[in-house]
Amino acid sequence: MSRIGKQPVPVPTGVDVMIEGQKVSVKGPKGALDLTVAEPITVSRNDDGAIVISRPNDERRNRSLHGLSRTLVSNLVTGVTEGYTTKMEIHGVGYRVQLKGANLEFALGYSHPVVIEAPEGITFAVQAPTKFTVSGIDKQKVGQISANIRRLRRPDPYKGKGVRYEGEQIRRKVGKTGK
């Protein structure tokens, strides 16, 4: 049996979970999220009030969906209680970020400023001209927006300039040697 899938998802106080067939709806202090679980997987509540994910048989596809579904439901519960945050930083001379309303405006060495609009459920915060955070309750959305921002100017392997996650180690290359 899936080691991750067989563990029940604890539901903290203040979180309301609705299960209707394959659809799981979670409401908490930070907001509400929905998830439709893949077909062979079933979702139910146990006596403790925890969410239990089960599969009908041990087919390969069902085994893989079992752990995935449990993790996705767990991410919903964590999202509506704590939320998710990605810390990012910018390295490079003249590279900076500023908050314009709810949107981020980047100066990344292009001939124009790059504006990233905040989608619904995502908030940006700027701590310094080179440090900012992406926050929200949906883990997938926070990660996707962070990846899109990083893609604006990927870290350069020679000088390390660009947008990166906080604490990310960039593999550096040695430049050409002169004669």
UniProtKB/Swiss-Prot annotation:
Disulfide bonds: none annotated. GO terms for biological process: cytoplasmic translation. One of its GO terms (cellular component) is cytosolic large ribosomal subunit. It comes from the Bacteria. Transmembrane segments: none annotated. InterPro entries: Ribosomal_uL6-like, Ribosomal_uL6-like_a/b-dom_sf, Ribosomal_uL6_a/b-dom, Ribosomal_uL6_bac-type, Ribosomal_uL6_CS. NCBIfam families: L6_bact. Part of the 50S ribosomal subunit. PANTHER family: 60S/50S RIBOSOMAL PROTEIN L6/L9, LARGE RIBOSOMAL SUBUNIT PROTEIN UL6M. Belongs to the universal ribosomal protein uL6 family. This protein binds to the 23S rRNA, and is important in its secondary structure. It is located near the subunit interface in the base of the L7/L12 stalk, and near the tRNA binding site of the peptidyltransferase center. This is Large ribosomal subunit protein uL6. It comes from Mycobacterium marinum (strain ATCC BAA-535 / M).
